[in-house]
């Protein structure tokens, strides 16, 4: 499953190769996808290469080869410009007492199947994922009401809040947050990170819980809340 940005970039590269015989420059890709910097293009290119859609040819400038295009199942549901994406899509876990849905291979009537929607960065923001991979079984009384999902934590920027690399973060879907909440924040509609949310005047601060990382101060129009942390699932 490709994200909307990944699909748009792959389509743009493929069309340019057909039209001109050479791939677009990074500046052209940045402008075509309305990104603020070329670092976002580097991340998208790497993601497409890792997924086997493109190949970068060594020792040649601007040498990108499109290996394949996604089939219908690998395309975003809506790839047109102006579409507002959500990093978390699909049917999320809901508590439906008194008969919660059991997780896969789990028949405990007191548990709920919570979908794992990908990985979340507790460190440098990583590209947002939109694919549901599997479910985990969570005690129903941990969740309360509303919709929930889980994200695998990658990084160590929240260790002082007790959130470790490899933990499964349990998230209540929400688009608002109070100061002090630990949230899933979508930055510039393309990167997701797990940080503590605070308001600083007219700006939003995304604070790590590790002195080795810096606080990010961003205008509200660059940040969209995707949910609030309600618990952790950890295997020993």
Curated annotation (Swiss-Prot):
Record-annotated membrane-spanning stretches: none
Keyword annotations of the record: Autocatalytic cleavage, DNA damage, DNA repair, DNA replication, DNA-binding, Hydrolase, Repressor, SOS response, Transcription, Transcription regulation
UniProt-listed GO biological process terms: DNA repair; DNA replication; negative regulation of DNA-templated transcription; proteolysis; SOS response
Pfam families registered for this protein in UniProt: LexA_DNA_bind (PF01726), Peptidase_S24 (PF00717)
GO molecular function, one term: serine-type endopeptidase activity
Catalytic activity of the protein: Hydrolysis of Ala-|-Gly bond in repressor LexA
Positions bearing the site annotation: Cleavage: 122-123
EC numbers, comma separated: 3.4.21.88
DNA-binding region: 26-46
InterPro entries attached to this UniProt entry: LexA, LexA-like, LexA/Signal_pep-like_sf, LexA_DNA-bd_dom, LexA_repressor, Peptidase_S24_LexA, Peptidase_S24_S26A/B/C, WH-like_DNA-bd_sf
Active-site residues, record numbering mapped to chain: 157 (for autocatalytic cleavage activity), 195 (for autocatalytic cleavage activity)
Stretches the record annotates as Disordered: 85-109
Subunit organization: Homodimer.
PANTHER family named among the record's database cross-references: LEXA REPRESSOR, LEXA REPRESSOR-RELATED
Role: Represses a number of genes involved in the response to DNA damage (SOS response), including recA and lexA. In the presence of single-stranded DNA, RecA interacts with LexA causing an autocatalytic cleavage which disrupts the DNA-binding part of LexA, leading to derepression of the SOS regulon and eventually DNA repair.
Family note: Belongs to the peptidase S24 family.
Protein name (record): LexA repressor
């Amino acid at each position: 499953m490709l994200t909307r940005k990944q699909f748009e970039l792959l389509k743009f590269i493929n069309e340019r190769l057909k039209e001109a015989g050479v791939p677009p420059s990074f500046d052209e890709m940045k402008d075509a996808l309305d990104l603020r910097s070329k670092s976002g293009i580097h991340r998208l290119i790497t993601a497409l290469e890792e997924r086997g859609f493109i190949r970068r040819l060594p020792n040649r400038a601007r040498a990108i080869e499109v290996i394949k295009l996604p089939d219908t199942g690998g395309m975003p549901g809506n790839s047109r410009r102006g579409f507002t994406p959500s990093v978390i899509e699909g049917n999320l876990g809901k508590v439906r007492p008194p008969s919660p849905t059991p997780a896969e291979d789990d028949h405990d009537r007191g548990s709920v199947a919570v979908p794992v929607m990908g990985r979340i960065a507790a460190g440098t923001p990583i590209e947002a994922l939109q694919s549901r991979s599997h479910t985990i079984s969570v005690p129903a009384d941990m969740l309360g009401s509303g919709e929930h999902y889980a994200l695998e934590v990658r990084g160590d920027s929240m260790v002082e809040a007790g959130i470790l690399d490899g933990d499964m973060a349990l998230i209540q879907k929400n688009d608002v947050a109070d100061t002090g909440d630990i949230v899933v924040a979508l930055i510039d509609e393309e990167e997701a990170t797990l940080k503590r949310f605070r308001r600083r005047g007219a700006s939003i601060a995304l604070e790590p819980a590790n002195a080795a990382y810096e606080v990010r101060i961003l205008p509200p129009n660059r940040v969209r809340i995707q949910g609030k942390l309600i618990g952790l699932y950890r295997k020993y």
